[in-house]
Amino acid sequence: MDSERLNKPKGGYIEGIRGVYAGYIIEMEQGDELTIGSSVTEANLIIRNEHVSGRHCTITYNGIVGSYTVTDFSKEGTYLSDGTRLSCGNPTIVPVNTIIYIGDIENAFKVR
């Protein structure tokens, strides 16, 4: 086996590609939910930025079908790489390799 395969998480993962979490890998297993925001009481991944709400969005992993559900709760918006702004409060299913922008283009994550 090559070393790249050995280092990849077994489930899904979220990769920080821009901003304070660039280069970080957050492992996800079936049903895991990650809450991103600026509030230490409302989020478990904290981004201190004027464009990030206290509870900005959640990302939930569905390992059975290999997709993620993203739900926006913010004022500034959660966007996909094609510029689509997610509808606030409505869960959106996104496939792996989707890039998600949190508030603005300065904070971006790729779901894998």
Which residues does each predicted region cover?
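Intrinsically disordered, low-complexity acidic Ser/Thr-rich regulatory segments
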Residues: 1-50, 60, 64-65, 93, ...
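Amphipathic hydrophobic-ligand
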Residues: 52-54
